[in-house]
């Protein structure tokens, strides 16, 4: 998915 935040752990 698409990374969000500092380390791309959140996914949209």
Swiss-Prot record:
Keywords: Calcium, Hydrolase, Lipid degradation, Lipid metabolism, Metal-binding. Signal peptide: none annotated. The keyword Metal-binding applies. It is an enzyme of class 3 (hydrolase). Optimum temperature is 50 degrees Celsius. No activity at temperatures below 25 degrees Celsius or above 60 degrees Celsius. Optimum pH is 8.0. Stable between pH 6.0 and 9.0. Binds 1 Ca(2+) ion per subunit. It catalyses: a 1,2-diacyl-sn-glycero-3-phosphocholine + H2O = a 1-acyl-sn-glycero-3-phosphocholine + a fatty acid + H(+). GO terms for molecular function: calcium ion binding; phospholipase A2 activity. Its EC number is 3.1.1.4. Belongs to the phospholipase A2 family. This is Phospholipase A2. The lineage of its organism: Eukaryota, Metazoa, Ecdysozoa, Arthropoda, Crustacea.
């Amino acid at each position: 998915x698409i990374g969000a935040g500092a380390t791309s752990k959140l996914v949209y």
